[in-house]
């Protein structure tokens, strides 16, 4: 393996280590924010779509490439999904069985860390969330 290739791989490893450290640092802040929200209002909604949208918008505008903006959104969808799960289980009910369009749409919106609850009828979707 060439020295150039090895050097680039070592640089990627170093960057990956930084990303991991920063993700854990971000997670600690998320946990603290969750505690503050619960102190202010025990019934507080942990998921704040407006805040998510603002983050996506800010990062999209900041991106100068070459990493694709659509990929940034997908990466941050998973970061936010995992972050929300640190604050408590995120239940998402959807109509139909697993791997249907509704299930896939929910996964695209809420990420892979949410707890997905399939339902056969629309009324069951509401009941599943309330459980």
Language model segments and positions:
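Domain-level signature for soluble enzymes in the chorismate/prephenate branch of the shikimate pathway
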Residues: 1-131
């Amino acid at each position: 393996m060439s020295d150039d290739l090895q050097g680039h791989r070592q640089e990627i490893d170093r960057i990956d280590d930084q990303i991991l450290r920063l993700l854990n640092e971000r997670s600690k802040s998320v946990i603290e924010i969750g505690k503050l929200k619960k102190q202010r209002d025990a019934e507080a909604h942990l998921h704040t779509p407006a805040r998510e949208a603002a983050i996506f918008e800010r990062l999209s505008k900041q991106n100068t490439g070459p990493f694709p903006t659509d990929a940034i959104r997908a990466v941050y969808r998973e970061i936010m999904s995992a972050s929300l799960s640190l604050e408590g289980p995120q239940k998402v009910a959807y109509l139909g069985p697993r791997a249907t369009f509704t299930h896939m749409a929910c996964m695209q919106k809420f990420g892979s860390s949410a707890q997905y609850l399939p339902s056969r009828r629309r009324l069951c979707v509401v009941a599943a969330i309330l459980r």
